[in-house]
Amino acid sequence: MIETPLITKVPKSTKPYTKVLFKPDYNRFGIQGLTADMLGLLKKRVFDIAAVTDHSIKKVKIGFNEQLSPVKNFQNYVDLYVGNKSETKRIYESSDERWEYAIALAPNHEFTQVSFVNGICTFKGGKHVDYIMNQITRKLCDYIEKKKKVKVTPTSIKEQLMLFLRC
């Protein structure tokens, strides 16, 4: 259901802003209300949006249920998954405003990726994930072979890593 926008007058001293509210039509969806799982998914998506929004252009405030998101940039988003930098070591790189990634050791020794292309979550990965991971694993294989004189496969390295990627 789309309602008529509510436009209110504010004092001239108030900075201009746009506030977008989401109110699901429970009847249309055939549900009585939002479950805890649904709320969790919506909250995750709000954090996703906060992570991929370019906060340098404008001071954007993103919130959920009247509470501002703690995520102010992509690095904050990575912290939600693996803890802060002092708890979990990671490598972070931002080559330009279009590519940004972080690598950390996977806690469960299974490759995991969290990636976005143009602000859209690509939970199944894709060519962008392969592109970055192939470069990382190839360089690590070369480094380990040169420094430690041990031959390892890219797959054995990949399964130990967690990749966060925004492009």
Stretches found by the model and what they are:
Residues 59-159, 163-167:
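GHKL/Bergerat-fold ATPase module in large chromosome/replication-associated machines
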Residues 1-72, 76:
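GHKL-type ATPase core
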